[in-house]
Every structure is written in structure tokens, then in C-alpha cells.
Amino acid sequence: KTDMLMYYDARVNSSMNGLFKRGTLDRLKGYYSVKAWGELLSLRDECALSCDVPDIYSAAATDGETQMLLVTYYTDDAAPLPRTFKVETGEDRLYTIYTLDEEHDMEPFETIASNNGEFTLTMRPNTVVVIK
């Protein structure tokens, strides 16, 4: 169980700051991961998860009305391939996928409908998605 995320150095004029660009305060990629984690924590009630897909890590929470799933595909492989896996939701409805990668800054990427309480997700290496 992970109950805390610590970011070592978020001083705005520090070269170690991975949240904001030095001198301009423009958001860097690290900002969006920390923001998503904060949103997840604000929902309060964590959900049990299991995943047997290598290099895929996830966390989920709900407040009784809103559900959120955060999934990351992190790898150090020299030539990693995309990973495709099933996401079991338990209900049929539309889900919005927010993506953080080289081209996207945790913005809505696609809307997907679950079928029989599940859908298939493909992630590129070193990507984070939020599913709401």
C-alpha cells in the first residue's frame, strides 16, 4: 500500500526541480504526474488492484461518486514495445483516457466504452494515463 508520494526538490529556481521550467515556471512533465497523484488522493478511498503485466503500475481511488485509475508503464528496456492489456471496470459506461507522454500533457486522449465491464488499453513505454 502506497500512502504517500514525496517529491524531493520543487524549489522553482533549483536545477533539480522537475515540475517547473527554471526561469519561466512553465510546467514540465513531472508536474502532471504529481497533480494526478494529488487528485487520486483527494478521492480518499483506495481501491484494491491487481496487475500481472510487466512494468505496468497502477493505483485507484473513489469518493463514492467519482472513480479514478492512474496507470503507468515504466521501463528501462533499451527497445521497449507497447503493452496491451485488459482493464476490468465492473460496469459498462464511457471512460475518458487522459495521457501524459512526449506529445500530451495529461489531456483527454480518447473516450472508450467498456463492454461487459472491461476494455482493452494499449500503452507506449514511459507513459502515464488517468482513466476517469
Describe every region a protein language model picked out.
Residues V34, L69, I97, N126, ...:
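Hydrophobic, well-ordered secondary-structure elements that form the walls
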Residues K1-S58, D63-G64:
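Aromatic/acidic polysaccharide-binding cleft in carbohydrate-active enzymes
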Residues E110-K132:
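C-terminal beta-strand-rich structural cap/linker in extracellular carbohydrate-active enzymes
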Residues D3-L5, Q67-L69, Y95:
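Hydrophobic beta-strand segments of well-ordered beta-sheets in folded domains
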Residues I56-S58, D92-I97, F119-T122, I131:
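Generic structural motif
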Residues D52-E91, L100, N126:
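Carbohydrate-binding surface patches
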Residues V12-M16, D77-A79, H104-M106:
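Flexible loop/turn segments at secondary-structure boundaries
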Residues E88-T111:
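C-terminal accessory region downstream of the catalytic core in glycan-modifying enzymes
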